[in-house]
């Protein structure tokens, strides 16, 4: 099957919080992009399927970019599937990332960067899936290699925190993702996800604030009888410990000048657990009760 499409995006933002606007006059910034995409899927035989495509992006601000994509799926039987993917990606900076200059009540600043360039990436993945009447499992390993990665970086100067957007020359993400859905009983379902990501440093500095480990789990119970439905969900989310570097300015008396320096932020891991119970009577009245962050 052959798929062709066109997508046009036109963003406009009117604000008094743009850079270079000391008088805080209302100004409008705009970005426009047009994308064309073409994709074809080919079923070679009952076990093999291949798809290939091309996406192009054009904007007056950043010019033309072409991005290929290819994917293959192998299904040795009805329960197993193996997938491999490659795609090239592209993202232009947003109006906020380019032009914003926002003061949050003197506590911190968000600063755009008009000199930023679009980020580009090459994405590779290999995954497997298994399913039967009650169980679905999937796992994926991936690598994402960026050039001119758009990143928000915390810096401190003028006695204030500043969140600034910038291009990183290169960044590499390696990750694993796993998903579980198990119908333990007809009325009881267990869901779970886990992700691991390793982000490269930028000249020895870890500016990315993503946690390496994250997981979610939920247990869903459903009960139904005439004119009544009960649904109870217990869910938990885990966010692992994360470390990243924040830029500061350090004054050196011997040199009588200040230099950029970094200090390490170390945020602990945490778990959030929620419980929600909903009851529906006669398909007309629904009562929901819930507790967020149960154990804290």
Language model segments and positions:
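Conserved C-terminal beta-signal and adjacent last beta-strands/turns
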Residues: 207-296
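Residues on the lipid-exposed face of transmembrane beta-strands in outer-membrane beta-barrel proteins
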Residues: 1, 38-40, 70-74, 126-130, ...
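Transmembrane beta-barrel strands of outer-membrane/channel proteins
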Residues: 4-10, 52-56, 70, 84-88, ...
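Face-selective signature of the C-terminal outer-membrane beta-barrel domain
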Residues: 1-62, 75, 130, 135-142, ...
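Outer-membrane beta-barrel signature, preferentially recognizing the C-terminal barrel domain
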Residues: 75, 81, 88-146, 156-183, ...
């Amino acid at each position: 099957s052959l798929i062709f499409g066109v997508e046009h995006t036109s963003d406009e933002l009117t604000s008094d919080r743009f850079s270079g606007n000391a008088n805080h006059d209302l100004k409008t910034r705009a970005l426009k992009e047009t994308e064309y995409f073409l994709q074809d899927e080919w079923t070679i035989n009952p076990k093999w399927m291949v798809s290939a495509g091309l996406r192009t992006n054009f904007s007056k601000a950043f010019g033309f970019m072409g991005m290929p994509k290819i994917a293959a799926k192998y299904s040795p039987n009805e329960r197993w599937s193996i997938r491999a993917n490659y795609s090239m990606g592209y993202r232009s900076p947003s109006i906020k990332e380019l032009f914003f200059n926002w003061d949050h009540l003197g506590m911190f600043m968000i600063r755009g960067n008009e000199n930023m360039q679009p980020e580009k990436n090459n994405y590779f993945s290999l995954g497997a899936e298994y399913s039967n009447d009650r169980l679905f499992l999937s796992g994926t390993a991936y690598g994402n290699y960026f050039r001119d990665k758009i990143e928000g970086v915390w810096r401190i100067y003028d006695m204030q925190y500043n969140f600034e957007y910038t291009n990183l020359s290169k960044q590499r993400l390696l990750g694993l993702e796993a998903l579980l859905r198990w119908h333990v009983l007809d009325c009881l379902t267990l869901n779970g996800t886990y992700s691991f990501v390793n982000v490269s440093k930028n000249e020895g500095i870890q500016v990315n604030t993503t946690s390496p480990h994250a997981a979610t789990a939920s247990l869903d119970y459903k009960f139904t009888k005439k004119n009544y439905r009960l649904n109870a969900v217990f869910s938990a989310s885990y966010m692992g410990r994360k470390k990243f570097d924040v830029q500061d300015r350090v004054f050196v008396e011997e040199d009588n000048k200040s230099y950029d320096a970094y200090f390490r932020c170390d945020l602990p891991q945490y778990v959030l657990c929620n419980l929600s119970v909903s009851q529906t009577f006669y398909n007309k009245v629904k009562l929901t009760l819930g507790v967020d962050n149960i154990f804290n």
